[in-house]
């Protein structure tokens, strides 16, 4: 490819609405062009990256035995009504009507359509397992699209769906896809982690996210450097506290804490570590009558250490709270505690509540909590002496760096990541909702056991940039760079030797199957180099009249700060070695 034939459009400044590095650089490098909120044109340079991502994904999915299909972007609402998602998905699901007034949706995922294919086509256990995948445009009507391709409304995604005869074979399909994903992300050349994720109502541990490591990532990734334990912040656990609760050493006392309504300020006033304070969170569950109207509520008090934060996913698994909970209203709090939020605690309640305690609090002695009176707290509080043992003890909190890993291998660390893939065991959630069955070996109808597996094809280049960039621009890994090598001849239009040498090297690289571009635009050296550093092509060869007279060219990898001079006769061999050819 010659640059004069290609479309190159770079900008010196990023648009004002670009907040993150990837959005700024993708726009400046001419990879994408905004059309509307969360909607982008994939320009030629950007499309080359996307096609390389797709090619790797397609190769590994085929290698894993998955079969490619393409399902419609516009889907009949009837199938989504079968699963209940037509209403449950809320405004993120874009709904449209055709000229006849029939309802349709623009697909964000395709569980319904692929399950419909299975129930029509997969009649017998002899046809299983099957795994269908597509690389297709999706749409989610994000309330606030931002960060360019990181959180757009229209995007390209690879979604795959496995169908098995039972849970055991479904787990084999899951592990097959997990292994395929590891090969895919290894080939991308990115730093990533496969982390355990919450499985929601389905339960179990068969749910993992593939996170590209980046300091700008939205997700917190918890891992143990001494083992293979890794989980997202919602799923991560610390090692349960060991040993019995210490004996009480203090008498309970009511102390004035004027104006100090937070654990931090109370700890500061009393000269105590924050970990000796206990925060009170008040939740409520609603009781419904036969008509579905609220007929009453149950108030719950959660106790966590002052230096810990509540994990809503974990709280939602507590029996009684698993039906759905909300934060209590001020009126409910005053009714049960006789106090405004800020000084709440479990002692001296006006009305009884369900007491749920984090397991770290359950083994504390002589702790500090609110006195249920403005400007007062209680010190020296102990379970069994000053208040009854809790109704429930559970893991309710987010882990923090330095916690013990649950496998006992060391301490947990936390880093930021960008989710670009997810493998998930679905069970019979969709097959049951859509009555998708096959004839089992016993001759009876049986529900498909399903799994789903997604990769954000257009999100991945943005994540790669967040991980691989510098002040000059993008630094692409070889596997997904728009071009692997750029040949930069200086004064090509004025020097026949430079032109001949550049075209010869270009032709030799093409013959080897290298994705190479020859910059024949006639740009000044500074502008030419700045363009390719911004675009991020990994390997650059510079040819000049003076260098060729000395029998030399310059080679520079995009990560290098300076170019390396080498014999012109050696540069092809050097590139072959660097590219593994």
Curated annotation (Swiss-Prot):
The EC number(s) this enzyme carries: 6.1.1.15
Catalytic activity, as annotated: tRNA(Pro) + L-proline + ATP = L-prolyl-tRNA(Pro) + AMP + diphosphate
Subcellular location: Cytoplasm
Family annotation (Gene3D superfamilies): Anticodon-binding domain (3.40.50.800), Bira Bifunctional Protein, Domain 2 (3.30.930.10), YbaK/aminoacyl-tRNA synthetase-associated domain (3.90.960.10)
Keywords: Aminoacyl-tRNA synthetase, ATP-binding, Cytoplasm, Ligase, Nucleotide-binding, Protein biosynthesis
A GO BP entry: prolyl-tRNA aminoacylation
Keyword Aminoacyl-tRNA synthetase (UniProt): yes
One Pfam short name: tRNA-synt_2b
Record's GO cellular component terms: cytosol
Function description: Catalyzes the attachment of proline to tRNA(Pro) in a two-step reaction: proline is first activated by ATP to form Pro-AMP and then transferred to the acceptor end of tRNA(Pro). As ProRS can inadvertently accommodate and process non-cognate amino acids such as alanine and cysteine, to avoid such errors it has two additional distinct editing activities against alanine. One activity is designated as 'pretransfer' editing and involves the tRNA(Pro)-independent hydrolysis of activated Ala-AMP.
Quaternary structure and interacting proteins, as annotated: Homodimer.
Domain text: Consists of three domains: the N-terminal catalytic domain, the editing domain and the C-terminal anticodon-binding domain.
Name the record gives this protein: Proline--tRNA ligase
Protein species of origin: Delftia acidovorans (strain DSM 14801 / SPH-1)
Upper lineage: Bacteria, Pseudomonadati, Pseudomonadota, Betaproteobacteria, Burkholderiales
Gene: proS
């Amino acid at each position: 490819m010659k640059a004069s034939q290609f479309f190159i459009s770079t900008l010196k400044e990023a648009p004002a609405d670009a907040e993150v590095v990837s959005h700024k650089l993708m726009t400046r490098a001419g990879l994408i062009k905004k059309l509307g909120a969360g909607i982008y044109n994939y320009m030629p340079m950007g499309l080359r990256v996307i096609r390389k991502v797709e090619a790797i994904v397609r190769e590994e999915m085929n290698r894993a035995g998955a079969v490619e299909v393409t399902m419609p972007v516009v889907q009949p609402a009837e199938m989504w009504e079968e699963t209940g998602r037509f209403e449950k998905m809320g405004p993120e699901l874009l709904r449209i009507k055709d000229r006849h007034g029939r309802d349709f949706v623009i697909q964000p995922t395709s569980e319904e359509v692929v399950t419909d294919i299975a129930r029509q086509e997969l009649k017998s256990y002899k046809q299983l397992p099957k795994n269908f995948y597509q690389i297709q445009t999706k749409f989610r009507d994000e309330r606030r699209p931002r960060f360019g391709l990181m959180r757009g409304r229209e995007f390209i995604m690879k979604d795959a769906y496995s169908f098995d005869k039972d849970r055991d074979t479904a787990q084999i399909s899951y592990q097959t896809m997990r292994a395929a994903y590891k090969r895919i992300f290894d080939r991308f050349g990115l730093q990533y982690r496969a982390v355990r994720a919450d499985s929601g109502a389905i339960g179990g541990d068969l749910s993992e996210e593939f996170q590209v490591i980046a300091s700008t990532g939205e997700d917190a990734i918890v891992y143990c450097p001494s083992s293979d334990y890794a989980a997202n912040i919602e799923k991560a656990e610390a090692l349960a506290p060991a040993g019995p609760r210490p004996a009480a050493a203090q008498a309970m006392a009511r102390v004035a804490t004027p104006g100090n309504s937070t654990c931090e300020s109370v700890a500061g006033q009393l000269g105590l570590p924050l970990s000796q304070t206990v925060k009170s969170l008040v939740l409520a569950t609603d009781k419904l009558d036969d008509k579905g109207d609220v007929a009453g509520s149950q108030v719950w008090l959660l106790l966590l250490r002052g230096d810990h934060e509540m994990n809503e996913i974990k709280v939602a698994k507590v029996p009684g709270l698993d039906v759905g909970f909300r934060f209590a209203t001020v009126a409910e709090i005053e009714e049960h505690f006789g106090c405004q939020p800020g000084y709440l605690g479990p002692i001296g309640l006006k009305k009884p509540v369900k007491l749920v305690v984090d397991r770290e609090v359950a083994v504390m002695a002589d702790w500090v909590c609110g006195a249920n009176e403005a400007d007062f707290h209680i010190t020296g509080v102990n379970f069994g002496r000053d208040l009854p043992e809790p109704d429930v003890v559970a893991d309710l909190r987010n882990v923090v760096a330095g916690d013990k890993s649950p496998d006992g291998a060391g301490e947990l660390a936390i880093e930021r990541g960008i989710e670009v893939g997810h493998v998930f065991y679905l069970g019979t959630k969709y097959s049951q909702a859509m009555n998708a069955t096959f004839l089992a070996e016993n001759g009876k109808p049986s529900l498909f056991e399903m799994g789903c597996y997604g990769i954000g094809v257009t999100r991945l280049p943005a994540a790669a940039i967040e991980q691989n960039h510098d002040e000059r621009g993008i630094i692409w890994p070889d596997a997904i760079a728009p071009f692997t090598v750029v040949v930069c001849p200086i004064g090509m239009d004025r020097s026949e030797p430079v032109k001949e040498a550049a075209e010869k090297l270009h032709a030799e690289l093409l013959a080897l199957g290298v994705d190479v571009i020859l910059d024949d635009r006639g740009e000044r050296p500074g502008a030419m180099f700045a363009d390719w550093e911004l675009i991020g092509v990994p390997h650059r060869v510079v040819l000049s009249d003076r260098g060729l007279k000395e029998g030399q060219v310059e080679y520079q990898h995009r990560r290098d700060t300076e170019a390396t001079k080498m014999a012109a006769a050696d540069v092809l061999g050097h590139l072959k070695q660097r590219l593994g050819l």
